Swiss-Prot record:
Pfam families in UniProt: ClpS
Subunit field text: Binds to the N-terminal domain of the chaperone ClpA.
Entry-linked InterPro entries: ClpS, ClpS_core, Ribosomal_bL12_C/ClpS-like
Protein's UniProt name: ATP-dependent Clp protease adapter protein ClpS
UniProt similarity note: Belongs to the ClpS family.
Alphabetized Gene3D superfamilies for the sequence: 3.30.1390.10
Amino acid sequence: MSIIKLEKGDNNNAAVLEKKTAALKNKSPKYKVLLHNDPVNSMEYITIALREVVPQLSEQDAIAIMLEAHNNGVGLVIVCDLEPAEFYSESLKSKGISSSIEKDE
């Protein structure tokens, strides 16, 4: 919701526009990209694939995510908007790695 306020300037020909936005902006929902435990592919392959698919991950981050999935059954890869989340998950699947997305709460 926006409030627009118009005022006449000194010469009666200029206008000042004041716009106030609501405190709560519409935020797009975020989605979690999840990596599932993979008994088929090697840990090294999964780490490399994570870094190829999500380039902003460091090697240490990729290893930590892979180990989280290995030890707990699922690891959190990244939280982002829906479109990139779908892209990351599908890219991992195309490399034979089990992945899913779910809405972040």
